[in-house]
Amino acid sequence: MSGSCQFLSRETLSSSLGWIPLINALREIFTENVVCPTRLHYPIDEDNPSSTANNILLIMPCWIPGKFLGVKQVNVFPENTKHGLPSLSSHYLLSDATTGCHLAQLDGNELTSRRTAAASALASSYLSKEDSTSLLIIGSGKVAEKLIHAHCSVRPIRSVRIWNHRFESAKSLASRASKELPSIQIDAVPIQNLENAVKCSDIISSATLSKKPIIVGSWINPGTHIDLVGGFTPHMHEADSKCIQISNVFVDTRKGALHEAGDLLTPIKEGLFSPNEVIADLFDLCNNKHSGRSQLKNPAEAITLFKSVGDSREDLAAASLAYKVHNKSS
């Protein structure tokens, strides 16, 4: 691991990070000895009383002793969408953990969206029914787009519905995804038809920055798997408290989800859910300490819910895989 620092673009990451290899890399890193300090989280407008923005700076370091060292900077500016700009901008720096030499700078947005979707698919491989054929995507951003491909890589999905509070955005994503996955029926859901779409879906995957619940617990049918991706602060909510109450809850990491996920912290504060009710995290699943849906009482009818807030070991797994694949092929 030597030489000049490379730049791995969005296009390079897209070609280097196939879904199954990436999912397997995530599965493996949750079994390894990884140093993963707490993510640093800074509300950058906190000291500006005149600002109504909720802009956030995230710093996420991680390393495997003797192998790779990485750090990601993420800037979250939710109001950017009003100006036609991305709400999330990031970059990743990968280094040699033995020498400290920089190996590669990677497009952080592509890295984040791909590893996030892959983590959801990894969880789904344990938690959704193996014969799941219908997928509902809530949201229409970059992560939502990746979630379609990731979920379809682990389950025999035949139909995908996309819902967004801006219908035209959902239609645009449906059009793009249909061209990329021509064998799958992909449609946009009219804004008023969300409840019916939820009731008709085997897997529901939500990737929004919503501060108000979108998914209502009373809409959920037995056997459904719910994947909550978007909310990564205590003030964000994609599902109501009833949805958490009726579900068998799994998380990416207990430390992260129980500290940052509003979808869990709100029902905990309301006395409707306890941290002890989290059944397992990705460490448990990947190390065979819990088998997921198959270990639940009445697996066919169980409602499963996976809440993720992101973890820096996922970035390191994706970045190191991309670096190795790119250098093997170049």
Curated annotation (Swiss-Prot):
NCBIfam families: PRK06141.1
Pfam families: OCD_Mu_crystall
Keyword field: Cytoplasm
Main location per the UniProt record: cytoplasm
Family (UniProt): Belongs to the ornithine cyclodeaminase/mu-crystallin family.
InterPro entries tied to this protein: NAD(P)-bd_dom_sf, ODC_Mu_crystall, ODC_N
Stated name of the protein: Uncharacterized protein P11E10.01
A Gene Ontology molecular function term of the record: catalytic activity
GO CC, any one term: cytoplasm
